[in-house]
C-alpha cells in the first residue's frame, strides 16, 4: 500500500507543471513554438531591412528574452508576455 501511494505521489509531481514557463515562437530553419528557458519570460519580434528588403520584405527574428532588447537604428522590436504572442507577420492567426 505504501508503495502504491508513493508511486502515485511521484507520478502526480512529474505530471504537474511546478513553475509557469512561457512559450514563444522562434525562428530558425522553420518557425516553431518552444518553451522558453527559465528566466526568459518575454517573447519578442525584431524586424529590419537588409539588401533584399525591396523584394523579400523585412527580416523577422522571433524568440524568448529576459528583457526587451534595445532598439538599434532601422530596427523595430515588440515584446509581449503571453504564450505565443509573437507570431510571424505572415502566419495565419488561429
Curated annotation (Swiss-Prot):
Annotated CDD domains: TFP_snake_toxin (cd00206)
Tissues where the protein occurs: Expressed by the venom gland.
Disulfide bond annotation, renumbered to this chain: 24-43, 36-64, 49-53, 68-79, 80-85
GO CC field: extracellular region
Signal sequence residues: 1-21
GO MF, any single term: ion channel regulator activity
Keywords: Acetylcholine receptor inhibiting toxin, Disulfide bond, Ion channel impairing toxin, Neurotoxin, Postsynaptic neurotoxin, Secreted, Signal, Toxin
Coiled coil start-end: none
UniProt name for this protein: Long neurotoxin LNTX8
Species of origin: Ophiophagus hannah (King cobra)
Amino acid at each position: 500500500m505504501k508503495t502504491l501511494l508513493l508511486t502515485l505521489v511521484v507520478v502526480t509531481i512529474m505530471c504537474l507543471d511546478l513553475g509557469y514557463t512561457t512559450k514563444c515562437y522562434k525562428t530558425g530553419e522553420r518557425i516553431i513554438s518552444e518553451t522558453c528557458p527559465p528566466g526568459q519570460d518575454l517573447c519578442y519580434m525584431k524586424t529590419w531591412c537588409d539588401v533584399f528588403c525591396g523584394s523579400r520584405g523585412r527580416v523577422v527574428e522571433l524568440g524568448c528574452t529576459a528583457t526587451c532588447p534595445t532598439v538599434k537604428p532601422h530596427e523595430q522590436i515588440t515584446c509581449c508576455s503571453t504564450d505565443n504572442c509573437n507570431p510571424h507577420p505572415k502566419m495565419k492567426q488561429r
